[in-house]
Amino acid sequence: MSDSKYTIIFDELDDQFRNEDIYKSNIISLIKVTERINSLFYKKNVKCKIILLLRLDIFYVLNDPDLNKIEEDSSVKIDWGKNDDKNSPLFDMIILKLRQSMDPKIEKKLSNQDILEQLFPESLHTSKGRCISSPKYILGRTYLRPRDVVTYLNHIKDISPDKEYFSKEAIKSAERKYSSYLFKEIKNELCGHLSNEEIDESFKLLKQFKKVSFYYAEIEEYYMKRTNLFPHINLHRMLELFFNFGVLGNQWTVKKNGKSRSYYSFSHRENVDIDFDKKFNVHLGLRKELNLY
């Protein structure tokens, strides 16, 4: 008998997701059958494992008495952490990939910090004039997922293919194209949770409202005066889903010792619920595509 180990991976199960009984029933059946087959493989000492890759937002709309046990016993949640600066494991991943493209003799002599300083600017200025580190600038425009970071860096390379580092100008110039990518990503993820009409009208509302930060009462007033333009929207539900998918976060200010400091919470960074009493804030990575500044 062969000593080889085999792994069968099912990916892209969320393609064309619809929040409908037949879709959910098929996914539930696939999860349960996979669990049974993997258990059988283990008992028979078969060196094979089946892995299903599924988004959490889809898993949590599935209802079945066996799913909680399967989640506890047999699932692994891929989490790249909440850190959005140079200490993020995402930047460790990027630096590892950069090392692989370097001369081995040179690469061995460089620390991660050395590579970071050589290839990225120390800081960038935001539209409000704040000075922040380049890792924080880049990661703040992502959902802290590898594909977001890699896509952003690839767009930067496309803008300045001859440069051996990521310049401030290229990072900022690539932001609009990257924002278009992120916008398409989030629209695809919202499919099945909202109709196509709801998705289009919801983003149209944000775009026409033209505010990156606002209270519920403000957008409600704007919406109520223009309901004929957004006939498919339930505003409360739209904001809840936009919060759950990271399109919007909450923002609040704390005053201490005569100084004010703003805080932000987004669902992709913390396990938080929407707070309609706090301000809403549009995700940085979507603002260019929505023409919000």
Identify the meaning behind each predicted range.
Residues 2-7, 12-127:
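The catalytic "switch" region of P-loop NTPases
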Residues 122-293:
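C-terminal leucine-rich, beta-strand-based interaction scaffolds used for sensing/assembly
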